[in-house]
């Protein structure tokens, strides 16, 4: 829908008068002076009377004068001109608003930081809510949540979570799937296609019958963790798997349901995760369990379930496998280590003895057994062994070499050959041995047969034991579906492709390094660092995402140098683009008054450039406003200057640039001729009479007030007479007042109260009851209601202690407070105090000595630096006079010693006074 000014006057005939048949025509009328110029065509300059300026126009134009009659066409043209002007004004306002918005957006880095802080605060609240149940078990310890917290932070950060299959960002409103092995997040359609393609590639060499019999796995694109085909994701669940299609909630972790996770911890301990539904691995179990150590000798202690296995560090003392020694290692997990000791042990046959580890008592020597077998004719040919040697291997029924005949012969005789043909299968597994029964292996097959090559394309007659391979190269495509086999005489089961894949990965930066394969390549394993402007904050993203990933928000301070007269910029965060304008105080010295400029820095103020060519009319496209950075002059000085008002009532601070006589707007206040009132006019200039600056002048007003003479000090009532000069009559009104103790109300005649002396006034204002006030010692005053402070002569019994507070007695309160009675320490107290003083003195002396040594070392180091290297051209006749150690350091030693002595002296007399 177009704006009204665009809809009005559309078409080529805009500005023409409408015909009588097409619509109502406007009647001619007078043309105002402001619209006279509208009767000329656009671009023809005119003067204020509607006459074309001389020397302008298009040659000999007919628009040279304004004496033309006013017609309907002229009135219509004026209306169109007004619409055009309105259109021009609307465009101008829109451009100004756009420029203002652009300037605000360009210099709103502080607002962006405030928005970032709000987002960070919201994220912190969600994280705290997610980890509340866990931190309540760990007393606020977050050290075990570092890995899980990283996954949760990446879930909140835009562009941080990337699907490795399609190399695209994972958004909050997209269905996702999380791997249970590496916890990587993928788009649901991407992982479904990946699983389908992986199963197809694995099962493609098989027949249709075998395909249904096996459940071929598919791997995770990142960690290669294998899943069954039945585990292919088909529905979108939250991280904990409780809610299907979790709703999008801005106050929850993206793709979570907000419920407690309740997944079992790994390794399984019987407890479940306490966090709210979250990405990434579950943290270690925070539950407390009571468990004993590995050797089960120590008492059970409460420990975290995730670290429940512990060692008491006591010797294990379990019997080792050797059954002779005990384990000396500290309490440990699992079986004990083999015995580390060495002992003399016999071999299995018992002939040899050797020093061997106690953990391996069984060993064999290299000698043949040699024992006589039960037959009595042969000896045992086994290597050193345990137990009986067994029967003679040549005794009992034996077979001939071809295994066709059995013989029962003594062990001393060999089995003869039977004379029959051997008939054993040869190595070719097709023919049998044609020789007579013989000892030893059969010969190779020498029969000639018609052999077919491995690929089945050629045949040839040749010896059976020789293989036949033709020279034909296989033309089949390997399993990668890209390269030919080209193996000579291939059997059809072509080997896998051994070339490198080399296809460009989804990142468009690297090529696949794997062996040539079918289907999609695995995602690029590389990561790219996306840095902020100062390169201190780095965000690792999968390769290929660096072009679309926004740089991370850096919290470091911007290090760009200042471009104004200030030495350094205000502290603000690292950013791209120009720095925000300086907001520091200008502090330039003003020319007129030498004060410092207090306004914000204006060296680089953004000012709209003036003097640009203006459009001649609405038909021209207005040029975009241009802003330039210009140093503005300092504003007028606003430093307050003390200035006296006209009536000399006050000295008020006025701005430095406007300091001068002024009216303070107060009443004049000078005493009038009556002597009772003052001038009530607003502060004005007064001419002094006879040099008296306290009397009213001729400019002051006359007195018209009532009597305002001062009453007696105790009388609060006004005089009812008009203003007069003599004394006022006595006051007879009753006054309600409080007694001295402020408890009872007393009614006294105003005259009596005001005319009474101090003693009589004290009696009049007393309620004659006991004073309720509390003395400084804490006891109640015993006197009758009285004026002033209570007496401090308290006779209440209180407890008194000696200075070291070892001895105590009961004494009168006033005597104790005035210090007339004191309880001195006895000899026991003095001994205790003396020992304490000696210990303190030793500590102070040690501190003084240590300080002296430190100052000595610093002084020597300082002098060594001052001396520097000796010059080679130093005169030989100079004699260096060395000062003694006391002359060098007596100042540095005496000052701390005197200070410590003064402090000890003051402390001692303070304790004595107490």
Curated annotation (Swiss-Prot):
Zinc finger region(s), RING-type: 163-224
Gene Ontology CC terms: membrane; nucleus
Polar residues: bias regions: 59-73
Transmembrane segment boundaries: 892-909
Biological process terms in GO annotation: regulation of DNA-templated transcription
Alphabetical list of CDD domains matching this protein: NF-X1-zinc-finger, RING-CH-C4HC3_NFXL1
Ranges in a coiled coil: 830-879
Main location: membrane
Zinc finger motifs (NF-X1-type), residue ranges: 269-287, 322-341, 375-394, 428-447, 455-476, 480-499, 507-526, 674-702, 715-733, 777-796
InterPro entries: NFX1_fam, Znf_NFX1, Znf_RING
Location of the region described as Disordered in the Swiss-Prot/TrEMBL record: 1-120
Biased composition range(s): Acidic residues: 110-119
Membrane-topology descriptor: Single-pass membrane protein
Localization terms from the record: Membrane
Key words of the record: Coiled coil, Membrane, Metal-binding, Repeat, Transmembrane, Transmembrane helix, Zinc, Zinc-finger
Composition-biased stretches (Low complexity): 16-34
Domain of life: Eukaryota
Annotated family: Belongs to the NFX1 family.
Protein name: NF-X1-type zinc finger protein NFXL1
